[in-house]
Curated annotation (Swiss-Prot):
Keywords: Ribonucleoprotein, Ribosomal protein, RNA-binding, rRNA-binding, tRNA-binding. This is one of the proteins that bind and probably mediate the attachment of the 5S RNA into the large ribosomal subunit, where it forms part of the central protuberance. In the 70S ribosome it contacts protein S13 of the 30S subunit (bridge B1b), connecting the 2 subunits; this bridge is implicated in subunit movement. Contacts the P site tRNA; the 5S rRNA and some of its associated proteins might help stabilize positioning of ribosome-bound tRNAs. The keyword Ribosomal protein applies. One of its GO terms (molecular function) is structural constituent of ribosome. The gene is rplE. The keyword tRNA-binding applies. This is Large ribosomal subunit protein uL5. InterPro entries: Ribosomal_uL5, Ribosomal_uL5_bac-type, Ribosomal_uL5_C, Ribosomal_uL5_CS, Ribosomal_uL5_dom_sf, Ribosomal_uL5_N. Part of the 50S ribosomal subunit; part of the 5S rRNA/L5/L18/L25 subcomplex. Contacts the 5S rRNA and the P site tRNA. Forms a bridge to the 30S subunit in the 70S ribosome. GO terms for cellular component: ribonucleoprotein complex; ribosome.
Length: 185
């Protein structure tokens, strides 16, 4: 018997509520003009990678647990002597999420992880790049429920980039606000 796949909450909300709201607010002529979240890139840069080359693979395992997708170990493109970095040396890990996994991750980020961040006052509404993409940083990866706090030997930060099809920052801001992203006012 085939198992029925469940649609992520945020995806359902996007197609049933958010699209109509954005259509009314920005008066799009075509349904394809309505902005949507294209992909989410989660990156961990490990500063101690020059000392211990096993750290990026440990970070990749944690990132895989957080996102539900296998992480890729990122390597140095060229050597930088002042940072003791050689070309090809592992420096971190990254994951690119699309479709259902992306919506599931955004749901966990907004509802569980961000409220657990220490001294959280909201996301900076100026962190858009001018083309509708939003970037944010989290200082501790242990805010995600998938990480067992007792088994963690090192706490790493991570960068989360939300890429949208929005043409302007205002459109992207409204899209993410509709997804309940807690922006500072």
């Amino acid at each position: 018997m085939a198992e029925e796949k469940q649609t992520p909450r945020m995806k359902t909300r996007y197609f049933e509520v958010i699209r109509k709201t954005l259509q009314e607010k920005f008066n799009y002529k075509n349904a394809m003009q309505i902005p949507r979240v294209d992909k989410v890139v989660v990156n961990m840069g490990i500063g101690e990678a020059t000392i211990d080359s096993k750290r990026p693979s440990l970070a990749a395992e944690d990132l895989g647990l957080i996102t539900g997708q296998k992480a890729v170990v990122t390597r140095a493109r060229n050597s930088i002597a002042t940072f003791k970095v050689r070309e090809g040396m592992p420096l971190g890990a990254k994951v690119t999420l699309r479709k259902d996994r992306m919506f599931e991750f955004l749901d966990r980020l907004v509802t569980i992880a961000l409220p657990r961040v220490r001294d959280f006052r909201g996301l900076n509404p100026k962190s858009f790049d001018g083309r509708g993409n939003f970037a944010m940083g989290i200082k501790e990866h242990i805010v995600f429920p998938e990480i067992n706090y007792d088994k963690v030997d090192q706490i790493w930060g991570m960068d989360i980039i939300v890429c949208t099809t929005a043409k302007t920052d205002d459109e992207a801001r409204e899209l993410l606000r509709a997804f309940n992203f807690p922006f500072r006012s």
